[in-house]
């Protein structure tokens, strides 16, 4: 038996001795501890359940296809109320390749009740997808394309890979010796199920946090405002060329009947796509035919025609 194995057995023996002492000196606390461990253990064994998979693209730091697995998991708490933020957990990214195609997989988990509500309401589903993308951008410092599409499959990869990603599991053993150095050994052992707990804590996004990036895609999911039908506006997209037929810029004209103020329009532009949301009445997301220069992009609102005109010079 190696020295490390002996040390491991020693610490396990110490742990059992502590449990024996607790059972003898404080039976009530011992009973509560065991009941909580059984409850947590059962919850820990429950696998995340894949619900849908979306495909989008990472633009920065390196351009790559991205698959986002949205799953429900009982380990994720439900929102405390209809006006509180929605807890969400983001797994670590995993780079993969099939044949010559390289891509990244990221798993995002919600409480089952949250995703069940999304099954009945497309507006809620879109909110949750946008929330997942924003979480990925903020947590991993990625820049994602605004456009996405639902894949024909519910899961990219395996259930086991998804669970390990969300839990941050590694193959090495946790440092039991370090855990026995304080009086809070039992609490530490309970929290040592995953080797890197920073992967698991929920990310709470409030409206204030979301607006810090310039636009608010996230509302409380139970808000009655989600029930408003969002229409796709009429638009005209054209590529302007020079005398030699070389593309110079893209012009997009969007008709927004009933809108009289540019303050109601929210515009997000990336190098490859554009997203327009207007006062919860209109929503337009387009892939652009050419890569554009986002810093040189301009927009103007023609009030008497209720039209938004966007000019996007090519990169």
UniProtKB/Swiss-Prot annotation:
GO terms for molecular function: small GTPase binding. Coiled coil: none annotated. InterPro entries: PIH1/Kintoun_subfamily, PIH1_N, PIH1D1/2/3_CS-like. One of its GO terms (cellular component) is protein folding chaperone complex. Belongs to the PIH1 family. This is PIH1 domain-containing protein 2. The gene is Pih1d2.
């Amino acid at each position: 038996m190696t020295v490390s194995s002996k040390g491991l057995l020693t610490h396990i023996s110490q742990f059992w001795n502590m449990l024996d002492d607790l059972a003898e000196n404080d039976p009530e606390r011992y009973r509560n501890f065991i009941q909580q461990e059984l409850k947590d253990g059962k919850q820990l064994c429950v696998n995340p359940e894949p619900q849908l998979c979306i495909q989008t693209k990472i633009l920065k730091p390196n351009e790559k296809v991205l698959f986002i697995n949205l799953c429900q998991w009982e380990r994720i708490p439900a929102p405390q109320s209809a006006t509180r933020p929605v807890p969400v957990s983001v797994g670590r990214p995993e780079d993969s390749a099939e044949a010559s195609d390289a891509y990244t997989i990221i798993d995002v988990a919600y409480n089952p009740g949250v995703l069940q509500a999304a099954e009945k309401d497309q507006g809620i589903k879109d909110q949750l997808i946008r929330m997942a993308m924003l979480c990925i951008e903020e947590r991993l410092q990625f820049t994602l394309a605004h456009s996405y599409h639902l894949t024909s499959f519910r899961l990219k990869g395996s259930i086991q890979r998804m669970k390990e990603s969300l839990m941050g599991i590694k193959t090495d053993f946790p440092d039991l010796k370090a855990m026995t150095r304080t009086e809070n050994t039992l609490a530490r052992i309970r929290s040592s199920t995953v080797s890197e707990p920073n992967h698991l804590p929920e990310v709470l996004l409030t409206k204030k946090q979301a607006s810090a990036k310039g636009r608010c895609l996230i509302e409380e999911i139970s808000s009655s405002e989600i029930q408003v039908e969002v229409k796709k506006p009429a638009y005209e997209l054209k590529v302007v060329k020079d005398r030699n037929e070389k593309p110079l810029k893209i012009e997009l004209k969007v008709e927004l009947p009933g809108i009289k103020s540019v303050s109601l329009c929210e515009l997000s532009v990336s190098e490859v796509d554009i997203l327009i949301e207007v006062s919860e009445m209109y929503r337009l997301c387009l892939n652009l035919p050419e890569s554009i220069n986002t810093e040189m992009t301009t927009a103007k609102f023609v009030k008497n025609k209720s039209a938004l005109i966007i000019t996007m010079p090519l990169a």
